[in-house]
């Protein structure tokens, strides 16, 4: 089973799309998923909730299954602000009430290590200017 958690339109029909990670508990059995994509959803939760989401994803992944996280990197966001000085755009991002935690790649890696010890980082890339895309595999 492949699960996409996020609000972007996806073309790949092999994924079941859900808007919220809490729904994962109801749509997949433990160790059923071969792929879970969390696309821009972690920032909607505080850090303790993010830790619980990570644990849930680990539980739902089968051995060799991949967890892919796409998220805004706060370090890059600050860098872009310092270079471009567009405080209006930065404020708009926080005014939507969609941001409850500020994640960086390093923080996510630390949280994965602490909350999902059976998952290892396997791939990392940048998506756009301020987002990271990182994949973890359950071992």
Language-model regions, residue ranges each:
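Class I (Rossmann-like) S-adenosyl-L-methionine-dependent methyltransferase catalytic domain
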Residues: 1-28, 66-139
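A short acidic, Gly/Pro-enriched loop at the edge of an enzyme's catalytic core
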Residues: 24-38
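A short beta-strand submotif of the Rossmann-like class I SAM-dependent methyltransferase core
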Residues: 34-41, 50-53
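A short His-aromatic
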Residues: 43-45
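Short, function-defining helix-loop hinge/capping sites that tune catalysis or transport
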Residues: 47-48, 78
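A short glycine-rich, Lys/Arg-flanked "PGG" loop and its adjoining helix->strand segment in the class I
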Residues: 51-66
